[in-house]
Curated annotation (Swiss-Prot):
Gene3D superfamilies: CoaB-like. Pathway: Cofactor biosynthesis; coenzyme A biosynthesis; CoA from (R)-pantothenate: step 2/5. One of its GO terms (cellular component) is cytoplasm. This is Phosphopantothenate--cysteine ligase 1. One of its GO terms (biological process) is coenzyme A biosynthetic process.
Length: 321
C-alpha cells in the first residue's frame, strides 16, 4: 500500500539526525573553499561536481535488521569520478557504503587476502600478479586525496543520502555555474517514515506483514530551484522497458529542469546510454570491451558544462577535452 508523497520539509523534520553532521559540514566547507579559490581551466575557480553513486536502503525498523534495497553496484559513479578528476574537476563522491570505489574497479573481486603473499622471511607483500594494478590504484587515489580534489562521503539509508545531498548542494551553490551534479545513485522511490517505523525487529510469529509505504519526496526540483539553482544538473533514468525510456527521460528533463538526462536500460546499461537534452538525443555505445563507456559520457558532459558556464558568465571556458 502506498501513501501520498510527503513534502521535503516534513521528510527532513521527521528523519533521524545525521551523525557527525557538524564534522561533515566542516569538511565540505573546507573542500569547497579550497577548490573555489584554486585556478581552473580558463581561470577562476576549479569546477566542482557531486557524483552520487550506489543504492539507498529503506530501513523497516529503527533498530534495523531488515531493509529494502535498490539495485546498484556503484560502478558507473566510481568510473565517472575517475574521469571527472582527469578532466580537472574536484569531486565530492557521495557513495553507498560497500559500493564500488574510484580506482578500485580493476582490483580482483576475490578475497582481499588473495592480494598478498608471505615471503620466506614472513614479510607480507602484494602478490606479483596483482602488483601493477594495486600500485596504480594506490598512486592515483593518493594523488586525488592529497591534492585535495576528492572528498568521499558515505551513506546507507535514504535518510542519510538526502540529508547529505542537501548539505552538499547548499555548499556547492557558492560555486555558481562551476558546480555540477551527476546524480547516478539509485534512490528509493518509497520508504517507511521514521515515526511510523517499528522500533525493534519485526517478529515473524504474527503472520503476514502488511506495510504502508510513503513516496519519497522528489528532491530534484528542490535541488534545482532552491539548494543550488545555478549548478549544472545531470540525472539518470534507468528503465527495464525500452518503450517508455525516452518518454521518462523527457519528463525528467522538463519536470525537474535538468540540463541533461542520461537514459539507460537495465539490460544494456554497461554498453549503451542515451544523452537527452532539450535539443537532441545522442546514443553513446561502448566501442570495445576494454573501453570505459564513462570516458565518453564525461567528455560530452564536460563539453556541455563548458557551454553552460559560457552562457551563464559571459566568460567562455574551454573544456579539458
Amino acid at each position: 500500500m502506498v501513501a501520498a508523497e510527503e513534502n521535503p520539509e516534513s521528510f527532513f523534520a521527521a528523519a533521524p539526525p545525521l551523525r557527525d553532521a557538524d564534522a561533515v559540514a566542516a569538511r565540505l566547507g573546507e573542500f569547497i573553499a579550497r577548490n573555489s579559490s584554486a585556478a581552473g581551466a580558463g581561470g577562476g575557480g576549479r569546477r566542482i561536481v557531486c557524483v552520487t553513486s550506489g543504492g539507498t536502503t529503506v530501513p523497516l525498523e529503527q533498530r534495523c535488521v531488515r531493509y529494502i534495497d535498490n539495485f546498484s553496484s556503484g560502478h558507473r559513479g566510481a568510473a565517472s569520478t575517475e574521469y571527472f578528476l582527469k578532466a580537472g574537476y574536484a569531486v565530492i563522491f557521495l557513495h553507498r557504503r560497500g559500493s564500488c570505489q574510484p580506482y578500485c574497479r580493476f582490483l580482483p573481486d576475490d578475497s582481499f587476502l588473495k592480494f598478498f603473499d608471505v615471503d620466506a622471511e614472513s614479510k607480507v607483500q602484494v602478490a606479483e600478479c596483482h602488483a601493477p594494478v594495486v600500485k596504480k590504484a594506490i598512486g592515483d587515489y593518493c594523488k586525488a586525496i592529497e591534492g585535495g580534489y576528492l572528498l568521499k562521503l558515505p551513506f546507507t539509508t535514504i535518510f542519510e543520502y538526502l540529508q547529505l545531498l542537501k548539505m552538499v548542494a547548499t555548499s556547492i551553490s557558492s560555486a555558481g555555474p562551476l558546480g555540477m551534479f551527476y546524480l547516478a545513485a539509485a534512490v528509493s522511490d518509497f520508504y517507511v517514515p521514521w515515526d511510523s517505523m517499528a522500533k525493534h525487529k519485526i517478529q515473524s510469529g504474527g503472520g503476514p506483514l502488511d506495510m504502508r509505504l510513503s513516496q519519497v519526496p522528489k528532491m530534484l526540483s528542490v535541488l534545482r530551484n532552491q539548494w543550488a539553482p545555478l549548478a549544472f544538473c545531470i540525472s539518470f533514468k534507468l528503465e527495464t522497458d525500452s518503450d517508455i525510456l525516452i518518454q521518462k527521460a523527457d519528463m525528467a528533463l522538463n519536470k525537474y529542469k535538468m540540463n541533461i538526462v542520461v537514459a539507460n536500460l537495465l539490460a544494456t546499461y554497461k554498453e549503451e546510454v542515451i544523452i537527452v537534452t532539450d535539443k537532441e538525443r545522442s546514443t553513446i555505445r561502448k566501442m570495445n570491451k576494454d573501453e570505459d563507456l564513462e570516458m565518453q559520457i564525461i567528455k560530452i558532459l564536460s563539453q556541455n558544462h563548458s557551454k553552460y558556464i559560457c552562457g551563464s558568465t559571459n566568460g567562455c571556458v574551454q573544456s579539458p577535452y
